[in-house]
Amino acid sequence: MLRKFALLAFLVMAVLAFTSAANAGSTVKIMTQNIDQGTGEGYIVAALFGQMPLPDAVDLTFAELQASHLKQRAGLIAEQIAAQKPDIVALQEVTLWRTGPDTEHAFTPVYDQLVYLLSDLLKRGVPYVVAGLNTVDDVALPGNRIGALRLTDRNVLLARAAFRWPPFYLSDMQSHIFTAALELGGLTVPSGWISATVHLGNQKFILAAVHLESTVPGYPPAIDVQVAQAQELLDTLSSATSPVVICGDFNSDANDNPTVVDYTPTADNIRAAGYTEVWGELHNGDYGNTWPLYLDDLIPISFPSQTPFERIDLFFTRGITALTADQVIATAPAGFAPPYGSDHVGVVATFEP
């Protein structure tokens, strides 16, 4: 009798363990992280508004890049990704910086944040592959001390290179550039997003990873562009019959704080279109601010620590359940500058298709 009872108890525990494993396998974990391109481009914007010569602004920007430890910061972010092990990572500001003798020949790579991050993840034994890449901008500007500085700005989707059950994969990967783009001092500044269908067993949903236009203090057209981009995103997704997850850097404060620089109607417009804002839903009353962890574009160049005052790194859902939402911060060692791996807090959410 005791042996029968022991066998029954063992079988019950085995079933519970199997059920728990199955439940764990039936969720998808997604992380969104703006990894900070190494400059807020404040010097360049000042030059475009006529506040300093453009070559001087380019020299300052390059000096800021040299001081921002892009390679080391990629390691800090990789450490957080390796700890969380999300199935998908949506990244913004994944930049490639190049220099050259002039703007027509700026071909020499100086910093490549994507290479740094993938290499660091591999070293940690948690490899990821590039599932989608959205080249948003590619512009070279003349300097004084350097001939030219070239920025290639990218949004990237990473997928974890690990077997899991039920079968997990991405399909229908698409790269999009918004029709609405910021015009600033003779430069066109585009923004973009990546979409994919995420499959888990016989379930699927659409993932849209976005980076909307940032605000420019004292320049209302930047907000108009951002609002138009968000509407274009919503219009594109409106015909989707599958559930939808939208994540990324929206540059719109979801807390609706009228005192912050990113006080725009975009987050509210997405809610009004029938989407649930995940952090607000799961952490009611917790502001969960994600930006900025430090300041940049200062003279002299420095990166003082800052308490975040707005929540712009977000998840929105339609027709799919978000189970959890947590924040991750890539803290640097004492005395390191900048004091964090990025000026943005990362957000990790788990979904059950």
Task: Mark where each language-model region is.
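Metal-dependent phosphoester-hydrolase catalytic domains
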Residues: 168-169, 235-245, 252-353
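N-terminal, active-site-proximal structural segment of metallo-dependent hydrolase catalytic domains
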Residues: 22-143, 147, 227, 353
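A well-ordered secondary-structure block
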Residues: 121, 130-209, 323, 330
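Bacterial N-terminal signal peptides that target proteins for export
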Residues: 1-9
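Bacterial N-terminal signal peptides
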Residues: 8-17
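Short, flexible/disordered intra-domain loops and linkers
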Residues: 98-112, 219-222, 255-264
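Active-site beta-strand/loop signature of hydrolases that rely on acidic residues for catalysis
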Residues: 30-35, 73, 77-103, 158, ...
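Surface-exposed cleft-lining segments at the edges of enzyme active sites
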Residues: 60-67, 175-185, 212-226, 254
